[in-house]
């Protein structure tokens, strides 16, 4: 089997990893270098933010993915020398309006990753002494982890580059799908070069709607811009992740702290905005006032692939027997990525599935 994967973000790369490990010949195409865009830009929380606000289909993939990332890191790190830097820092959430829902969710699903308790200021101080004294209560999720997105991407790319059955085609924009009855028998790039493959996987994230006309479906995936900021503190200065009013702080092992994130529906605009950055910083300083003492290293944006309810499309297109989707992960592309790729691989190779595929089925695009 020879598979073309269009898109080299986390979902395209993890799909390539899953398929290539089964001995399949994989070709990865991207309009720029592999591992950029939203996959690189995200914060790397290994759980949906406020999981009770999401459909359970999203949380299910996130649950599987957390364990898969640990397994992949154990396999790839000795070969690539790049550690994913998975940290179980836990998270403090300060949104009072979410306390009851969060506690009820944890009790209902009884997942270790989502175990939580409501705590008062004295315990908050013991867990994270950097938190503002104005925040009197929180719910604490001790099992929540984060992962360093760029390092995951670098490790996976380096590993795949070493595999004889994987080939990267970077800076090549695939612009056309060439149909033949009930399948796509070739793809064409912007320079009119044609490539023949047995199967096609579309993993183009925020750009996925561009395929709607050629696929004769309406693929409702479009970009939502998110802005981030990065501070540098001493290592281990901030002991936990923190979140309030959809803004978060994520500590890295080396003392960098990722702050985010905004949501703007402004197309493919990737410019940062001073007002948005001010809002992000104000929200983060409200949680951790001492952060203001440290240097702001940089700010950036990413384009999330928004989809209805944030549930990705994973599976085969019914009217094109060799075209598959793995896209539309919205804010949880990396969070769900490892499990999404595993589910896709199981689909493509007719293997037992980790979960009921119905919520992710492209069949719903035809209703």
Question: Predicted segments — roles?
Answer:
Residues 81-93, 105-108, 115-163, 262-266, ...:
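Helix-loop-beta segment of a Rossmann-like dinucleotide-binding subdomain
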Residues 288-290, 294-367:
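C-terminal catalytic lobe of FAD-dependent flavoproteins
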Residues 5, 9-10, 33, 206, ...:
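Residue-level detector of alpha-helix initiation sites
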Residues 4-6, 195-207, 341:
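Short hydrophobic core segments
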Residues 45-127, 283-285:
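Dinucleotide-binding Rossmann-like beta1-alpha1 core, especially the glycine-rich loop
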Residues 2-27:
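N-terminal Rossmann-like FAD-binding beta1-loop-alpha1 element of flavoenzymes
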Residues 14-22, 31, 44-46, 82-87, ...:
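Active-site substrate-recognition segment that forms the wall
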Residues 139-191, 195, 199:
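Helical element adjacent to the flavin cofactor pocket in flavoenzyme catalytic cores
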């Amino acid at each position: 089997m020879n598979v073309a994967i269009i898109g080299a973000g986390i979902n395209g790369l993890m799909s390539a990893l899953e398929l290539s490990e089964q001995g399949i010949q994989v070709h990865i195409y991207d309009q720029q270098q592999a591992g950029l865009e939203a996959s690189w830009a995200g914060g790397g929380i290994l759980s949906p933010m406020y999981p009770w606000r999401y459909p359970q289909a999203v949380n299910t993939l996130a649950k599987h993915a957390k364990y898969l990332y640990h397994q992949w890191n154990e396999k790839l790190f000795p070969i690539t020398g790049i550690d994913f830097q998975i940290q179980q820092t836990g998270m403090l959430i300060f949104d009072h309006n979410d306390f009851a829902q969060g506690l009820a969710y944890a009790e209902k699903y009884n997942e270790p990753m989502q175990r939580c308790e409501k705590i008062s200021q004295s315990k908050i101080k013991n867990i994270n002494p950097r938190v503002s004294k104005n925040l009197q209560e929180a719910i604490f999720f001790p099992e929540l982890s984060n992962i360093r997105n760029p390092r995951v991407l670098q490790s996976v790319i380096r590993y795949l580059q070493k595999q004889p059955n994987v080939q990267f085609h970077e800076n090549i924009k695939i612009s056309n799908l060439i149909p033949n009855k009930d399948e796509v028998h070739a793809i064409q790039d912007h320079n009119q070069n044609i490539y023949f493959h047995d199967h096609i996987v579309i993993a183009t994230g925020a750009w996925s709607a561009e395929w709607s006309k050629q696929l004769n479906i309406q693929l409702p995936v479009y970009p939502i811009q998110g802005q981030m900021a990065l501070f540098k503190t001493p290592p281990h200065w901030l002991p936990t992740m923190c979140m309030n009013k959809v803004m978060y702080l994520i500590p890295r092992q080396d003392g960098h702290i990722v702050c985010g994130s905004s949501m703007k529906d402004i197309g493919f605009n990737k410019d940062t905005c001073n007002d948005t950055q001010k809002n992000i910083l104000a929200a983060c300083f409200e949680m951790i006032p001492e952060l203001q003492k440290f240097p702001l290293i940089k700010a950036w944006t990413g384009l999330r692939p928004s989809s209805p309810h944030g549930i990705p499309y994973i599976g085969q297109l019914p009217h094109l027997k060799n075209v598959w989707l793995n896209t539309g992960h919205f804010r949880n592309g990396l969070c769900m990525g490892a499990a999404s790729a595993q589910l896709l691989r199981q689909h493509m190779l007719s293997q037992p599935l980790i979960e009921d595929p119905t919520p992710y089925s492209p069949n719903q695009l035809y209703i």
